[in-house]
Curated annotation (Swiss-Prot):
GO CC terms of this entry: chloroplast; DNA-directed RNA polymerase complex; mitochondrion
Keywords: Chloroplast, DNA-directed RNA polymerase, Nucleotidyltransferase, Plastid, Transcription, Transferase
Transferase found in the keyword field: yes
Subunit text: In plastids the minimal PEP RNA polymerase catalytic core is composed of four subunits: alpha, beta, beta', and beta''. When a (nuclear-encoded) sigma factor is associated with the core the holoenzyme is formed, which can initiate transcription.
Gene Ontology MF annotations: DNA binding; DNA-directed RNA polymerase activity; protein dimerization activity
Similarity-based family: Belongs to the RNA polymerase alpha chain family.
Annotated domain remarks: The N-terminal domain is essential for RNAP assembly and basal transcription, whereas the C-terminal domain is involved in interaction with transcriptional regulators and with upstream promoter elements.
Lineage: Eukaryota, Viridiplantae, Streptophyta, Embryophyta, Tracheophyta
Protein name, UniProt field: DNA-directed RNA polymerase subunit alpha
Known role: DNA-dependent RNA polymerase catalyzes the transcription of DNA into RNA using the four ribonucleoside triphosphates as substrates.
């Protein structure tokens, strides 16, 4: 456990982690502070951050299981202690860590008698089981158990369909919520008009990411939501003849880049996220898996660096070069200086 003393301050706005601990492989806790804030700001930030932590962060989970000769979800299999439904519920609880996008296949193939745990899941290299001791099933006889699994990255909670598949495939309630809980509290200090606030933010995660990582991703998601308003005063708003109605021109990547040509400040580059670009989904996913999130991140790499990214092709590099040349008249260097 790590603890630091919290002291009120009138210095520039800053944040720090004042407590961090791992209660188990599937329960991490972190406590953070942000200060000094003006009266009312702490509650504004705290509410928005809590919503982003609980609803905007993506997670990876098992969404479907398939096994032959299973008539329905509530049936039992000779030689297995648990029912099919209980096995599906155990698979639902498996915590995975991954940066994958799209759907991946995994499997379990074991022979009893033995206890089947998360360690027996055969998954792609990009997927990691957080707690390999998580129980799945108990085989009481020398039988073979083979289960095909489908793994997907998403966010929030998705209810399974009630209809069973004809091929022995059963959907699982997808709980893609790495943050178990998040709370915020406010400490006020000072007198009269000099009153200021300290925001305390508590985060519990399931082990697939740390509270600090969750805070970083939630902050990035919030920034991404507000980007269209950053230069709203520079956009031309087209008012219709009816004064009670108006149409705002859609936010597009080329429009933003046109503004950046006039103002190539580093902070502006940090405000352009690659998910707002015109890059194909495949290229975008490869970049994000390599922690390239903003235009500034992208411009910090050479063509040689991009080619080292897993699953990246020369066509992807050309697409990026074309986009940068078209909107910025900038070329990425072939090699690092």
């Amino acid at each position: 456990m790590v603890r630091e003393e919290v002291v009120g301050s009138t210095r520039a706005l800053q944040w720090k982690c004042v407590e961090s601990r791992a209660d188990s492989k599937r329960l991490y806790y972190g406590r953070f502070i942000l200060s000094p804030l003006l009266k009312g700001q702490a509650d504004t930030i705290g509410i928005a951050m809590r919503r982003a932590l609980l609803g905007e962060i993506e997670g990876t989970c098992i969404t479907r299981a398939k096994s032959e000769k299973v008539p329905h979800e509530y049936s039992t299999i000779a030689g297995i202690e648990e029912s099919v439904h209980e096995i599906l519920m155990n698979l639902k609880e498996i915590v995975l860590r991954s940066n994958l996008y799209g759907t991946r296949d995994a499997s379990i193939c074991v022979r009893g008698p033995r206890c089947v745990t998360a360690q027996d899941i055969i998954s792609p290299p990009s997927v990691e089981v957080v707690d390999t001791t998580q129980h799945i099933a108990s085989l009481t006889e020398p039988i073979d158990l083979c289960i095909g699994l489908q793994i997907q990255r998403d966010r929030g909670y998705r209810m399974k369909t009630t209809k069973n598949s004809q091929d022995g495939s059963y959907p699982i309630d997808a709980v893609s919520m790495p943050v178990r809980n998040a709370n915020h509290s406010i400490h006020s200090y000072g007198n009269g008009n000099q009153k200021q606030e300290i925001l305390f933010l508590e985060i519990w995660t399931n082990g697939s990411l740390t509270p600090k990582e969750a805070l970083h991703e939630a902050s990035r998601n919030l920034i991404d939501l507000f980007i269209p308003f950053l230069h709203a005063e520079e956009e031309d708003i087209n008012f219709e003849e009816n004064q009670n109605r108006f149409t705002v021109p859609p936010f597009t990547f080329p429009d933003r880049l046109a503004n950046l040509k006039k103002n190539k400040k580093e902070i502006a580059l940090k405000c352009i996220f690659i998910d707002q670009s015109e890059l194909p989904p495949r290229t975008y996913n490869c970049l994000k898996r390599s922690n390239i999130h903003t235009l500034l991140d992208l411009l910090s790499n050479s063509q040689e660096d991009l080619m080292k990214i897993e699953y990246f092709r020369i066509e992807d590099v050309k697409q990026i070069l074309d986009t940068l040349q078209k909107h910025f008249a900038i070329d990425l260097p072939k090699n690092k200086f």
